């Protein structure tokens, strides 16, 4: 039997890329590849790229320069290293990648990575292989299922892609061009995926998509299902105790999604709902198709049915034409909503998008100053949200052993990391702290450490608790 080949994947960007990287591992496992944590001993290196932020492609070319040196070093010891560029930069740049970086063997877009084995074989024969067209077939129908031991090794939380692409065409965004039009997976395929994950120890599922609440997959009744209806079905899967979804668009929040948050205990009271700006003129220039008031009404609808719900968001400062009054409207919106956290970025033009051709660019110094002011406000809100947990008892889903001996780490319903030292009084004879992995237990929060909650167990775990790896659950 041939020895296994080593695979190293460096993934950039969004949750979708994390999921895609895992599926690339699944695609290549039948070809004899196993993951390695470093480039040094890799036979194949894949850069799974993101094209959302400024200079994304230049970062890839810089990394390829470093990989050229690693490849030369491997060759000097008689070992061949193949290099592939996948993801959205691959989709956007295509042949330009191999022109600028001849070290690359394979270029593959995000809708075609199920063809990686064939592309690697083609590169062996022809020197390189490119595939950046949107394929006719649905890649999900060709992706192999991960092995049970692989699922267990990935932990108790898992991403499941339910939708890809976007039809919104925000003027700053490349996603419609790199990921294509909105496509939703069938309900039956998603249910099968979630059941398989639950059978192998997964307790928390995050449904992901570029515009996840635009989900409209075909259900077993041959009708299109909404995300809310899908969540209701998945909440009934045995073993799944927490459900999340990301990323959402305000315009696609419908009654069924609101009602799902009202009715489903498993659906976490934490929603990432990007707004980008609080200024109506800027929202119009971004082609967001909603106003700041529309966004506030959506927030109010969630809070009306689930008062404890919290939100995070995305913001862009310095969009072309943004005035101080526009920026003040963003600060006002953030103040009014009150976020548990948010991501803020300076505008950067993405080639091929309408905003890249807009005039009235905001000076870099002004963008820097606005970003700092916005981030200070967001940080203060996040700090206040976390401090409010001190003295409270919160439910924590434990995920893994901590870095410190005797420590266990999990997350709250709001994705706050929680660090606990259970101690012998909370553990049975012979039980290690990681025997709590996969359980939801009450934690009394005593203090904070940066963004993490520190506390103690407020109740003893069940006597039958055992590590998931031991049960094979």
Swiss-Prot record:
- The residues forming a coiled coil are none
Annotated residues that bind [4Fe-4S] cluster 2 are located at 166, 170, 173
Here the disulfide bonds are: none
Q: Which species is listed as the source? A: Rhodopseudomonas palustris (strain BisB5)
Swiss-Prot/TrEMBL keywords: 4Fe-4S, Cytoplasm, Iron, Iron-sulfur, Metal-binding, S-adenosyl-L-methionine, Transferase, tRNA processing
Q: What is this protein called?
A: tRNA-2-methylthio-N(6)-dimethylallyladenosine synthase
TRAM domain residues: 387-459
Q: What does this protein do?
A: Catalyzes the methylthiolation of N6-(dimethylallyl)adenosine (i(6)A), leading to the formation of 2-methylthio-N6-(dimethylallyl)adenosine (ms(2)i(6)A) at position 37 in tRNAs that read codons beginning with uridine.
Assembly, in brief, is: Monomer.
Family annotation (InterPro entries): Elp3/MiaA/NifB-like_rSAM, Methylthiotransferase, Methylthiotransferase_CS, Methylthiotransferase_N, Methylthiotransferase_N_sf, MiaB_methiolase, rSAM, rSAM_horseshoe
The protein's Enzyme Commission number: 2.8.4.3
According to the entry, every stretch annotated as the Radical SAM core domain falls at 152-384
Q: Which GO terms describe its cellular component?
A: cytosol
Q: Where does the signal peptide begin and end?
A: none
**Cofactor(s) annotated in UniProt:** [4Fe-4S] cluster
Q: Which GO terms describe its molecular function?
A: 4 iron, 4 sulfur cluster binding; metal ion binding; N6-isopentenyladenosine methylthiotransferase activity
Residues that coordinate or bind [4Fe-4S] cluster 1:
14, 50, 88
Give the record's cofactor note, including how many are bound: Binds 2 [4Fe-4S] clusters. One cluster is coordinated with 3 cysteines and an exchangeable S-adenosyl-L-methionine.
Protein family: Belongs to the methylthiotransferase family. MiaB subfamily.
Name all MTTase N-terminal domain ranges.
5-125
HAMAP family linked: tRNA_metthiotr_MiaB
């Amino acid at each position: 039997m041939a020895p296994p080949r080593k695979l190293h994947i460096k993934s950039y960007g969004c949750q979708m890329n994390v999921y895609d990287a895992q599926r690339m591992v699944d695609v290549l496992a039948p070809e004899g590849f196993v993951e390695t944590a470093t480039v040094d001993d890799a036979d194949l290196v894949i850069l799974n790229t993101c094209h959302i932020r400024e200079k994304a492609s230049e970062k890839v070319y810089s990394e390829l320069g470093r990989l050229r040196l690693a490849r030369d070093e491997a060759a000097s010891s008689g070992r061949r290293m193949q290099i592939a560029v996948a993801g959205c930069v691959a989709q956007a740049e295509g042949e330009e990648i191999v022109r600028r970086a001849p070290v690359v063997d394979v270029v593959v877009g995000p809708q075609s990575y199920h063809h990686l084995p064939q592309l690697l074989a083609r590169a062996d024969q022809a020197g390189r292989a490119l595939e950046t067209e949107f394929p006719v077939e649905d890649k999900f129908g060709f992706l192999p299922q991960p092995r049970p031991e692989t699922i267990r090794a990935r932990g108790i939380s898992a991403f499941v892609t339910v939708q890809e692409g976007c039809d919104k065409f925000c003027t700053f965004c490349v996603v419609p061009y790199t990921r294509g039009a909105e496509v939703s997976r069938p309900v039956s395929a998603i249910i099968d995926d979630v059941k398989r994950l639950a059978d192998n120890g997964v307790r928390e599922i995050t449904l992901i998509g570029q515009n996840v609440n635009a989900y409209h997959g075909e259900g077993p009744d041959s009708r299109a299902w909404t995300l809310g209806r899908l969540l209701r079905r998945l909440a009934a899967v045995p073993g799944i105790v927490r459900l999340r979804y990301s990323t959402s668009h305000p315009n696609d929040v419908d009654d069924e999604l609101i009602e799902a948050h009202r009715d489903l205990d498993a659906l976490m009271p934490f929603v990432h709902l990007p707004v980008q700006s609080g200024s109506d003129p800027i929202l119009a220039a971004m082609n967001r198709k909603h106003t700041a008031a529309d966004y506030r009404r959506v927030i109010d609808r969630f809070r009306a049915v689930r008062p404890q719900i919290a939100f995070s968001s995305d913001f862009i400062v310095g969009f072309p034409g943004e005035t101080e009054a526009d920026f003040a409207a963003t600060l006002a919106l953030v103040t009014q909503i009150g976020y548990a956290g948010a991501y803020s970025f300076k505008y950067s033009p993405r080639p091929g998008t309408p905003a890249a051709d807009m005039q009235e660019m905001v000076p870099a110094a002004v963008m820097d100053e606005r970003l700092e002011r916005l981030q200070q406000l967001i940080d203060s809100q996040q700090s206040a949200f976390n401090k409010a947990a001190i003295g409270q008892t919160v439910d924590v889903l434990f995920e893994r052993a901590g870095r410190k001996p005797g420590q266990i780490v999990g997350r709250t319903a709001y994705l706050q990391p929680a660090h606990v030292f259970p101690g012998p009084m909370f553990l049975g004879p012979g039980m290690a702290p990681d025997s709590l992995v996969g359980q939801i237990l009450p934690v009394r929060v005593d203090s904070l450490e940066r963004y993490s909650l520190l506390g103690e167990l407020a109740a003893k775990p069940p006597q039958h608790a055992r590590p998931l790896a031991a049960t094979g659950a």
